[in-house]
Amino acid sequence: MPEITVRAKSKTYPVYINEFALEDVREKWTESLAKFSHVFVLTDEHVAELHKAKLDAVLADLPVVTYYVAPNGEEAKTFRVYEDVMTKLIETGLDRKAVLIAFGGGVIGDLGGFVAATYMRGIPFYQVPTTVLAHDSAVGGKVAINHPLGKNMIGNFYQPEAVIYDTQFFATLPEREMRSGFAEMIKHALISDQTLLRALMDTFTEPKDFYTKDLTPFLQRGIEIKANIVAQDETEQGVRAYLNFGHTFGHALEAYGNFGKWLHGEAITYGMIYALTMSEAIYGLDFDLAEFKTWLKQLGYDTTFDATVPFSKILENMRHDKKTTFNEISMVLLEEIGKPVIFKAEDDLIFETYKRVMRNGGNGI
């Protein structure tokens, strides 16, 4: 079974990925889990309905397993749900020898990791992602919940014991969720590898390809790209910020939509178009943005921007971005495909880029 090793400064751990990963690691994993005093599984309503029975079968021989089922979507990454999970842990009597399993998409991984990082100052946890989007969020140790004023504003860096990535869960993902996760695959290609980007564009040309073409080698490559960056910079003091390409604008848009109007990958797609447009203006990026947007449209993405979204709100939310320091907004831009840079953007440039993007396609958000 394909295995990728993540070598962060704080911990080294494996990422197991294939269509039957849970079955393939079952014996070894349950032996490890049996050493803990209690297994606590955090999932959401959707995943519990579709896949709980599969995880139950894997955990069947363990004596003490407790589930917490969170709401679907970004609603799970709130103070209210975080407190409720903590209350459940305390009432259940979990001690420091317990372990948490985050079983779901990126939201559950973020919430579960943050719960594990903060309960009794830290208990071990495993990531068992069920979505394409989670190939990015499950690896690297970023864990967080949202604040009404910004995405992932309350969090930590806390690495899992392992990531068990069973791709057969993708079969039940709606097309919109598949597309959202695929956006992070595009991001990895843009910041690292022109050849990878071309392979994505040649392989995936319509929405049905998400289900009929093999995603696994592209997911593996994306995880390898992220693992290499995390090995250099676990806590985002330098090159790890490159993984935020498209996220400064994208997170601002998510916050404007109250973390519900757009899925993460949808917002990041707008953010990547925005960042590519600024990269053309600042660095003369040699990139066929028109071809790129046409490809995105073929895959079902909406690439046009809505003039009714007030720029003032987007700018305000960008100021709350974690990369903003000394009131200077940091953008991840591209000098060329595969060559990201950090650029301190003035308000005038941010607005001019917004206007340029609007001129090239509006009224769609």
From Swiss-Prot:
SUPFAM superfamilies: Dehydroquinate synthase-like (SSF56796). It is found in: Cytoplasm. Binds 1 divalent metal cation per subunit. Can use either Co(2+) or Zn(2+). It comes from the Bacteria. CDD domains: DHQS (cd08195). Its main location: cytoplasm. One of its GO terms (cellular component) is cytoplasm. It holds the Pfam family DHQS_C. Keywords: Amino-acid biosynthesis, Aromatic amino acid biosynthesis, Cobalt, Cytoplasm, Lyase, Metal-binding, NAD, Nucleotide-binding, Zinc. The keyword Zinc applies. Pathway: Metabolic intermediate biosynthesis; chorismate biosynthesis; chorismate from D-erythrose 4-phosphate and phosphoenolpyruvate: step 2/7. Coiled coil: none annotated. NAD(+) binds at residues 106-110, 130-131, 142, 151, 169-172. Zn(2+) binds at residues 184, 247, 264. One of its GO terms (biological process) is amino acid biosynthetic process. Its EC number is 4.2.3.4. The keyword Hydrolase does not apply. It catalyses: 7-phospho-2-dehydro-3-deoxy-D-arabino-heptonate = 3-dehydroquinate + phosphate. Its cofactor is Co(2+); Zn(2+); NAD(+). One of its GO terms (molecular function) is 3-dehydroquinate synthase activity. Belongs to the sugar phosphate cyclases superfamily. Dehydroquinate synthase family. Catalyzes the conversion of 3-deoxy-D-arabino-heptulosonate 7-phosphate (DAHP) to dehydroquinate (DHQ). NCBIfam families: aroB. This is 3-dehydroquinate synthase. It comes from Listeria monocytogenes serotype 4a (strain HCC23).
